[in-house]
Amino acid sequence: MHQVIQLKILDSRIGDTIPLPAYATDGSAGLDLRVCISEPMQVAPQQTVLLPTGIAIYIADPKLAAVILPRSGLGHKNGIVLGNLVGLIDSDYQGELKISCWNRSQEHFTVNPGDRIAQLVFIPVVQASFEVVNEFTESSRGEGGFGSSGRY
């Protein structure tokens, strides 16, 4: 499935010295988001910073949203994860995409201009309504939770 999303460039370096968001491979689910800063930034251990991307998107279609997710290598190798764990971008949001970056390691981490720091994945959305009931139709699982369907 291919969807066209409106993208607004908020910083003139985007598309010039800092590439536009792009899929790294044909099989990539996420577009790499890059940091749009002027100079290297130190992120201290346990510090959280809000990093600009220099872009805004407008999804427009209420059946679509986007999520900002961490890059696995940064988290595993450097302890760099998203401060909010997942960033949800609603279809009607039009502001700059910013990345909450948390250094959960015990080492300082340097973020350089243009670094790929997160990824943007588009997802389908179902807007549900609720039907208030007194009882549910019984299922095999019932009310079991928190490990009830397996060892963990």
UniProtKB/Swiss-Prot annotation:
Any one GO biological process: dUTP catabolic process
UniProt pathway: Pyrimidine metabolism; dUMP biosynthesis; dUMP from dCTP (dUTP route): step 2/2
Entries under SUPFAM superfamilies matching the protein: dUTPase-like (SSF51283)
Main enzyme class: hydrolase
Entries under Pfam families matching the protein: dUTPase (PF00692)
Species of provenance: Legionella pneumophila subsp. pneumophila (strain Philadelphia 1 / ATCC 33152 / DSM 7513)
Molecular function via GO: dUTP diphosphatase activity; magnesium ion binding
Names of required cofactors: Mg(2+)
Annotated function: This enzyme is involved in nucleotide metabolism: it produces dUMP, the immediate precursor of thymidine nucleotides and it decreases the intracellular concentration of dUTP so that uracil cannot be incorporated into DNA.
Chain residues that bind substrate: R71, S72, G73, N84, L88, I89, D90, K98
Name of encoding gene: dut
EC numbers on record: 3.6.1.23
Lineage: Bacteria, Pseudomonadati, Pseudomonadota, Gammaproteobacteria, Legionellales
Record keyword Hydrolase present: yes
Protein name in the entry: Deoxyuridine 5'-triphosphate nucleotidohydrolase
